[in-house]
Amino acid sequence: MIDTIQYLLGPIERLCCLSKRQVLPVEIDDTTSALFELQSGITGTIGTLFATPSNSLLRIYGTGGLIEAKNEFSEVSFQGDGELYENILIQPSNTLTAEFSGFCDACEGHEAYPVSADEAIRNVAIIEAMSSSSKQMGEWMNISGLLKKGAV
């Protein structure tokens, strides 16, 4: 979801996060909540729950309406100010298979991988910042600062 948010709205600049194990019997965090601010000043939240059935939901609110993508992004809805939802159905695809196929194509020199090295590094920096923030009781983390320090 981090890469999708940045692709659509721009780079995440800073974030704070709480993450902990609440339900699962294995020693991994199963509940995570993060508040973030993009370089543009837009704010948002990311939440993950590994102890629930798999589900992906992206909802973007704006002054002129909202857009929502759900059911593994195969269903997109838009609602303008005071309007009914407009639903768009997209043919579902296995995104993991597509990702591996794209990686193989890039390795074989057929096509460039759709995610640049800089984008991948920034995505990892954000995940690392979420982990660090949670370990420091939700302290705000500056992503550009982490990248400049080479912390990732």
Task: Annotate the PLM regions.
Residues 58, 74-82:
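Short polybasic amphipathic segments
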Residues 39, 105-152:
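C-terminal helix-rich "cap/oligomerization" subdomain common to oxidoreductases
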Residues 89-101:
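Active-site loop of classical SDR/Rossmann-like NAD(P)-dependent oxidoreductases
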Residues 40-42, 54, 65-66, 83-84, ...:
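Short acidic/polar mixed-charge low-complexity motifs
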Residues 1-4, 56, 99-102:
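Hydrophobic alpha-helical segments typical of transmembrane helices
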Residues 1-43, 49-53, 118:
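Rossmann-like dinucleotide-binding domain that binds NAD(P)(H)
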Residues 12, 42-43, 64-66, 73:
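Structural motif
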